[in-house]
Amino acid sequence: MYRFKKAEAEAEFEQIFRLNHAVFAGELCQYAADSSARLVDKFHDKNLYVIAVSDEEVVGMIAAHDRPPFSIVDRLPDPGVLEQFGRLIEVRLLAIDPAHRSGMVLAGLFLTLYQHVRTYDAVAISGRVEECPMYHRLGFHDLGPPVRSGQAEFVPMALRVADLARREPRWRRRLESVRGPMP
């Protein structure tokens, strides 16, 4: 059973840092491994974190922020392409513990994020090349070619919040069929 919520407690943030290290340093080799087994995002102070919790353990998270500079700019051939989207929020990080990688966790994270981004025009993300089909199913569209970072390649993408709104009822039904009503 999963709970999806905005991260607020220090213990939740500590678990987020450990999950980030496991995924981005250990699995994707984007960052050097650290003896503390923690990875704090450079935009931590301005990030909104939504999390998936199972048995009081953070097993998935999305970190997003709405204040430039956006890291996606470094992955775009023409950063001006972002101007078409109006008010933008960037998903900086998406990490899910490998033992919990399922459509349900991803849908729950994005549904929870949606509750916090309804007033924006678009969501930007740099998605791993291997995960592009999943992002495309979510409604994201490529903004440029893949760009290497560490041992992974990322594709800059965006999704209009109005498109996310159209997908919300389907995600909500899927989650409620498994875990009961969502707030």
Question: Which positions does each model-derived feature cover?
Answer:
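Short amphipathic alpha-helix that is part of the acyltransferase structural core
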Residues: 1-39, 49-53, 58-59
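Conserved beta-strand in the GNAT
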Residues: 51, 56-67, 72, 90
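Short, P/G- and charge-enriched loop/turn segments at secondary-structure junctions
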Residues: 36-40, 77-80
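A short, polar/charged loop-to-alpha-helix boundary motif
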Residues: 31, 67-80
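Short, small/polar residue-rich loop motifs at catalytic or cofactor-binding pockets
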Residues: 44-46
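Feature marks short, surface-exposed loop/turn motifs that line or immediately flank catalytic pockets
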Residues: 66-68, 131, 163-165
